[in-house]
Amino acid sequence: MFYYGCFCSILCCCDSCHHSGCTAADIVNTYEEERLADIFYLYGELKNSRKLASVIVKARATRQISTIGDFLDIIKPLFGREREKKELAKVFQALRIEVNREMEALKEMLYAATEALKPGGRLVVITYHSLEDRMVKNIMKTGNIEGKAEKDFFGNVQTPFRLVNNKVIVPDETEIERNPRSRSAKLRIAEKIEK
């Protein structure tokens, strides 16, 4: 199920992470408890993020967490057997997102695309988890990541985009059968409009 090797490099999926020097091992061994909890809550959407962070901080006080095996031994008891695999996937997702700075990169790309597109140009984005999808949906509907609608004098929402599809596009059963990784994919399309 999981690779029990070095914890330092197993979660790094891109070269840019190596330039910043941040590894999953750095995160679990050095981040403050509150920051760890925030990462697990925001990026992994884990309800027990505070407890998870607390257990990690207590464990690392006695010795450094250096392998995935060490890490799993510490956190597995927090999850029930029936949900263990899903919950562990969320933990590793949160660490991967933090290591690779995925949310920051997506945010920068969305704002840059909003500025670069000319009226009539289309922004087409495929997301694979709810955090990404929320950001994309917000920028397409309101023009900002937070989803705060700016209104004109008459109360009309000011947005740089018009949604091309009212509903998000998801893979059908045939696509999922052919490509199981597509099951969580969501495609959103918006067209830049005149201001």
Task: Identify the meaning behind each predicted range.
Residues M1-K195:
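S-adenosyl-L-methionine-dependent methyltransferase catalytic core, i.e., the SAM/SAH-binding region
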